[in-house]
Structures are given as C-alpha cells and as structure tokens.
Swiss-Prot record:
The active site is at T5. It comes from the Bacteria. Its main location: cytoplasm. Gene3D superfamilies: Glutamine Phosphoribosylpyrophosphate, subunit 1, domain 1. Belongs to the peptidase T1B family. HslV subfamily. It catalyses: ATP-dependent cleavage of peptide bonds with broad specificity. GO terms for cellular component: HslUV protease complex; proteasome core complex. Allosterically activated by HslU binding. The gene is hslV. Its EC number is 3.4.25.2. Protease subunit of a proteasome-like degradation complex believed to be a general protein degrading machinery. CDD domains: protease_HslV. It comes from Campylobacter lari (strain RM2100 / D67 / ATCC BAA-1060). This is ATP-dependent protease subunit HslV. Keywords: Allosteric enzyme, Cytoplasm, Hydrolase, Metal-binding, Protease, Sodium, Stress response, Threonine protease.
Length: 180
C-alpha cells in the first residue's frame, strides 16, 4: 500500500469529480500539507489523480496525457494503450504509483502493475493509504445522503483525513459538468 495520499473519484448523475488531500509524507514525517495531486487533462474533459511516488506519478501523468492526446480524448482507448505501454516497458513496471482517471462516461484505476480496472459500480473509486476510508464514506454518502457530487467527494475525503495518518483535510477538487 502506498502511504502517500488519498484520491477519490466519483462519477455522478450530473458531474464527475476528483479530489485529493494535500499531505506529502516521507516515512513518519509530514513534508508538505498543500500539495496538489490531481490534474485536469484534455482541456478539462478528463480528470486524473495519483498516489505513490511523486516523481513516478509525474512520469505516468506525462505518458498518459500523450496517449490521451493521440487517442483524441478517448479515455477508454487511452487507458488500454497506457496498460499496453506499461507492460512493454521494463522501466515503467518498476514505477511505484497508481492513478485514477475519469470523464463523464468512464472511471478507471490504473494500477502499478499496468492493470486497468473499472469499478464494479462504475461510479466510485479511490486509491492511496486512505483510499478504503474515502471509498467507504463515499458509498455510504451516495446511498444515504442528498449531497451533490463535489460535496460528497469533499466529505468523504474529510472523513478519510480524520482517520488515516497519511492523509490530511486540505482537500482540492476538480469537476466536469454535463454540457448544457
């Protein structure tokens, strides 16, 4: 498990949201409280976040962004191509990072072994040391509250930040809304 962060992605009825905390840890020490581990890609039509080694994650972001561009913004194709590249490249197979990527149609977890996983419910995914806390909170809030998508992500990450020592409550979110 990566003791680095918590990233939560939620694909709701009207919006897709990704959120992450701001803590950067090195061993038992907090190095930074306001890091941004999420990004907008493809002119804001795709959202992505990472957990794990920061240097490795930036390499993965760059590679994924190139594949997304070459696939003309097709997230599914880019995710599959990403997995193929990851498995072919010996250097990439040693990277210690995971990513979540989503648009209004899909949400994928890209694992450190090159796997591409779409969550069973197709709506909620989380990674990082606080990922299971955030995922549990998001599932409960999605089922038992009337929170909008962005507030659901924020509240879920808040809960994870209160439980996981590698996650803080300095939360950043990005949103994709349906075209009106």
């Amino acid at each position: 498990m990566f003791h680095a962060t918590t990233i939560l992605a939620y694909k709701g009825k009207n919006k897709s949201v990704i959120g992450g905390d701001g803590q950067v840890s090195f061993g038992n020490t907090v190095l930074k409280n306001n890091a941004v581990k999420i990004r907008k890609l493809n002119n804001g039509k795709v959202l992505a976040g990472f957990a794990g080694s920061t240097a490795d994650a930036f390499n993965l972001f760059d590679m994924f962004e190139k594949l997304l561009s070459s696939s003309k913004g097709d997230l599914l194709k880019a995710a599959i191509d990403f997995s193929k590249e990851w498995r072919k490249d010996k250097y990439l197979r040693k990277l210690e990072a995971m990513m979540l990527v989503l648009d209004r149609n899909h949400i994928f977890l890209l694992s450190g072994t090159g796997d591409v996983v779409e969550p069973e419910d197709g709506a909620i995914a989380a990674i990082g040391s606080g990922g299971n806390y955030a995922l549990s909170a998001a599932r409960a809030l999605a089922k038992h509250s009337n929170l909008d998508e962005e507030n659901l992500v924020k509240e879920s990450l808040q809960i994870a930040g209160e439980i996981c020592i590698y996650t803080n409550t300095n939360i950043k979110t990005y949103v994709i809304e349906d075209d009106k």
